[in-house]
Amino acid sequence: MAPGEKESGEGPAKSALRKIRTATLVISLARGWQQWANENSIRQAQEPTGWLPGGTQDSPQAPKPITPPTSHQKAQSAPKSPPRLPEGHGDGQSSEKAPEVSHIKKKEVSKTVVSKTYERGGDVSHLSHRYERDAGVLEPGQPENDIDRILHSHGSPTRRRKCANLVSELTKGWRVMEQEEPTWRSDSVDTEDSGYGGEAEERPEQDGVQVAVVRIKRPLPSQVNRFTEKLNCKAQQKYSPVGNLKGRWQQWADEHIQSQKLNPFSEEFDYELAMSTRLHKGDEGYGRPKEGTKTAERAKRAEEHIYREMMDMCFIICTMARHRRDGKIQVTFGDLFDRYVRISDKVVGILMRARKHGLVDFEGEMLWQGRDDHVVITLLK
């Protein structure tokens, strides 16, 4: 047999052996994992409730004397005696682990539940409504606990400040009422016999109530509730989708009808209305587009652009000519045209606009290249 055929024959055998070894390794790993999982589940099921792993450990330096187990500990350690052990472990190991299991101590686990943000807000609103609604004597125990819990919670600083102010005002008011309460009534027999006892008792009570009302500032209704009610009303009125769409459509329809009456190219053109509403020379807005329209926006942008070009031309005139003794700056139209035509071809138009705004001055109504090159342009700025 050729050596090539021998190598090709040994290749499949090696691959088959490799596959078998891999399969046996995987099976053994799976068995070991399953055995460990079973032992762990049995161990967890036999552990007493409330036990923390590693929670309490005895110090190895100071061993305590072993006390005989009580009946309760025997009952707990009884189901732990037959745990499953992997193959190959002797009885000696089980006898050594038995006393370790019997020394397990119990520990109660307490869990504290912290209220969320919306629950704190509900508690604050509940307390505020109760203070606004009830004018009687507060219970000494429960309200203080609720107040302390809310004030010491990690809620909103604004909410804590409002609640703290409300509580401080209420406590001050109740203290004043408790201090002034003995002065409202008189236990004297002379006052009762004289006939002033009943009225004297009723009047100070009314005065005390008035004083308490003045000193205790109870928001009725609270500003927060009123603010939220106003916001809700505004939201319903302003942000109603149907009402919004209807109002906008009606407004657009009215504006369109009015514009068609003033449009001379429309069939609904009203000549009398147009003549009565037209602007005359000297009126504000005459010769300008209507404010708020796109034409007015385009006109504003054009004015800004032309003003920048006029300022550029004045700057170029300043750089070209020399200052005279009288302070005037002059340049001929031919020199300015040769220089500025490289920047913009609207030389004459910008000069005419600048003369209208009082920035430059020159003779003639119009300037022509070649014919008016000798015309002097004076900068007035």
Swiss-Prot record:
It is found in: Cytoplasm, Myofibril, Sarcomere; Cytoplasm, Cytoskeleton. Residues 300-381 are annotated as: Actin-binding 2. Gene3D superfamilies: Costar domain. The keyword Mitochondrion does not apply. InterPro entries: Abra, Costars_dom, Costars_sf. The modification Phosphoserine is found at residues 156, 188. Keywords: Actin-binding, Activator, Cytoplasm, Cytoskeleton, Phosphoprotein, Protein transport, Transcription, Transcription regulation, Translocation, Transport. GO terms for molecular function: actin binding. It holds the Pfam family Costars. One of its GO terms (cellular component) is plasma membrane. Residues 69-79 have a biased composition (Polar residues). Residues 39-156, 179-207 are annotated as: Disordered. Binds F-actin and ABLIM1, ABLIM2 and ABLIM3. Interaction with ABLIM2 and ABLIM3 enhances activity. The actin-binding domain 1 (ABD1) is intrinsically disordered, and binds to F-actin with higher affinity than ABD2. This is Actin-binding Rho-activating protein. The lineage of its organism: Eukaryota, Metazoa, Chordata, Craniata, Vertebrata. The gene is ABRA.
